[in-house]
Amino acid sequence: MVKLWYNCQGDAETPEYYIYNDRTRIGWIKNVDEDGYIDEILIYNSYRNMGYGKEALIALMNLEKRDLKLDVKVDNEQAMRCYLKVGFVPCEAWHQSKRDYIGMIWKN
């Protein structure tokens, strides 16, 4: 079962949440800002395609209790499938400077 551990250090270089499966760190979520924009989600390579990203996003949705937004590269089909499975829907990219990205939003 995936759990999120909140990192209270709170600087921009440190992940806001670490993702654990049992006692093993398997990834992190970086910077969920005041508007609900998620800067980056990473599941370590050896733990991909096992459903952990989906479980981590569901845990984050349950914690945050608000709309969440992110940008994903258009060619990152694996991440796109994960976001769609948990209820994110495509929209315009949140940061216009990211031309090869598509925005995703989850409405709480």
Label for each model-derived stretch:
Residues 14-16, 99-104:
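Short hydrophobic/aromatic beta-strand or adjacent loop that forms the aromatic wall/cage
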Residues 58-62, 85:
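Short, well-ordered alpha-helices that flank and scaffold nucleotide-derived cofactor binding pockets
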